Amino acid sequence: MRNASRRRLSLLLLFIFVNCAPSIALGQDRIRIGVPLFPTVSYPVFIAQEKGFFDKNGLKGEIIRINSEPTTYQALISGDIDATSGAPTGLVQSNIQGVPVVSLGSWDNLVSYTMITREKIDDLAQLRGKKVGINRLGGKSSLVLRVMLEDAGLNTSKDVTLLQLGGSQERLAALIRGGIDAAPVDFAFEPKMKQMGFHLVPGRKTPFMNGPITVTVASLKANRGKWLRFVKAYLEATQYMTTNKEGSIEVLKRIVPADDKETLDHAYEQMRARATVDLIPPEAAVENLVKMMTYVDKRAATVDRSKLADYSILRELAQSKAATKK
């Protein structure tokens, strides 16, 4: 009697497992994504999370804000997170050091900074002979600024004076009192800078791979199906972001420290306009990222570009989409 009861219980548990396992497995397929503390560059990740694109593709996303890129890549390599979004410098640095990580795609491929000035100028080249405030030499913002200025034909060692002033509040204070002539600011805060009486330098944005999705090569090989679903969700979120303003701004309110409509509308329109919807960055954007890294490590100049990215999932999804339309 007891053995028969055990057999019936075993059969019941087997029935429950067989019939419920697929949905449980999908629900438990977790992906932990490391993003910056100020994560506008990871915008599609938040949209995928909050608008159900991860759920739709059988994923449970866990977004983790991390305060520096070195810490982000330490977490990626150790397995504490599964992917990074919007942390480009470690992609090159890791490959220089022989650690195989790759980008699966990048939605944002322009520098995220705008130059603000006390006096109105027409382009960055007119900063020749001027003082520019930065956080610190060697920091990411100063390195990106160097790419921007060199793209405009300026030599940062000779043509401008870079002054280390600390954070944004210190740079703004220096601008107000005339201690510097210009400073970089995140594009999301352009309206506030205008309200304060500063001028925004017009002109084209410098190409720069700013928003890569980065994973370890080992994880990509071992979990390709999961990463295919992740990239699909990311593509869908990016498309949603470019076509659904109201829903996208709902998400943006949670990641941009601003509550006024003008700032939020401006930030959204900027991100919509700069989005690379197919996630494949222009060659110039990749080259400027590599160029930036040569400022801190000369070995970056010889890094194998083919090892920085694997777009095979993007190509597979594009082919599948094209076949469906036929």
Label each PLM-derived region with a short phrase.
Residues S10-P22:
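Bacterial N-terminal signal peptides
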Residues G27-L165, R171-R177, D181-F187, H199-P207:
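Short, glycine-/small- and polar/acidic-enriched structural segments
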Residues F46, V92, R146, P191, ...:
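Predominant activation on well-ordered alpha-helical scaffold segments within soluble catalytic domains
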Residues E62, T161-L163, F208, H266-R272, ...:
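Short linear loop/turn motifs
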Residues N223-A301:
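Secondary-structure end/capping motifs
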Residues V290, T294-K326:
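Conserved C-terminal helix/tail region of periplasmic/extracytoplasmic solute-binding proteins
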